[in-house]
Regions:
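Non-catalytic cap/lid and distal C-terminal segments of serine-dependent acyl enzymes
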Residues: 1-254
Length: 254
């Protein structure tokens, strides 16, 4: 490292504890592959401050804002995509994207495209438009997941009813009636590789009964899912953002 530094040769240097332990090598691999991939694409980051990644690239479409992973710059690689539908302003989006990229940098999860879809818009149509118009997206059921907030679960239900779009779904403070709950179960249960569900109820939610009903119906149908009812009031609805990302990305990469 000192010789490379003295000769001003671009490189990366990182000290890890663990020696020859497999876990040490395994956690180092993602960054090693990224380094090699950047070299192939003629983009070598090295240790210099001037070569640090630029601001996260994003694309604005009619009904969504799409953020690409930092690793996508200068690369032809295609990535899985996680859709998030609800009332989320631009500042909040950037905070969530930054948290996600930090998780990737810390090797907690894998890179993915994040697409924030406007509330109460046709989800299926929006997905179709995004994946036809934009490159760098692995548009398949196994590589696609959804986080839905409040009454936007109805858009998610319609999307699943039309076709099996998602490998995993996180429903946060879902709002609906008994028919919506029944429709969700029918939609999920109609696919052999059904989307796994994470049901999240935060203390401020006034629709505890609806989410509980979904949980009971999923359990009665013997469908694998997660159910979280939080007791402590948190600062904002995205306190458990990392939990949701890990759940969905693990579903994508099983």
């Amino acid at each position: 490292h000192r010789l490379l530094l003295e000769r001003q040769i671009p490189h990366e240097w990182e000290v890890r504890s663990g020696g020859h332990d497999f876990a040490c090598w395994n956690t180092a691999l993602p960054k090693a592959f990224r380094f090699i991939n950047e070299y192939f694409n003629g983009k070598q980051s090295g240790n210099s401050e001037s070569s640090l990644p630029n601001e996260t690239p994003f694309i604005q479409t009619a009904n969504a804002t799409v953020y690409y992973p930092e690793q996508a710059q200068g690369s032809t690689r295609k990535y899985p995509i996680i859709y998030v539908q609800g009332e989320i302003n631009e500042q909040q989006q950037k905070v969530l994207v930054s948290q996600f990229h930090q998780m990737v940098d810390e090797n907690k999860t894998w890179p993915a495209v994040l697409s924030f879809v406007k509330a109460n818009t046709d989800l299926s149509e929006t997905i179709s438009d995004i994946e036809k118009q934009l490159s760098g997206i692995r548009g398949s059921q196994r590589m696609r997941a959804l986080i839905t907030l409040g009454d936007n679960i109805k858009e998610g239900i319609e999307a699943i009813q039309r076709e099996n779009l998602f490998t995993g779904i996180v429903c946060v403070n879902a709002i609906g009636n008994e028919n919506d709950a029944q429709n969700l179960i029918k939609a999920v249960n109609s696919h052999k590789r059904y989307p796994r569900c994470w049901i999240e109820i935060l203390p401020e939610s006034k629709e505890y009964g609806f989410s509980s009903n979904i949980h009971i119906l999923l359990k009665e149908s013997d469908l694998e899912h997660e159910f979280r009812s939080r007791k402590c009031k948190e600062a904002n609805v995205f306190t458990y953002w990392e939990d949701w990302i890990l759940y969905l990305n693990n579903r994508i990469h099983v």
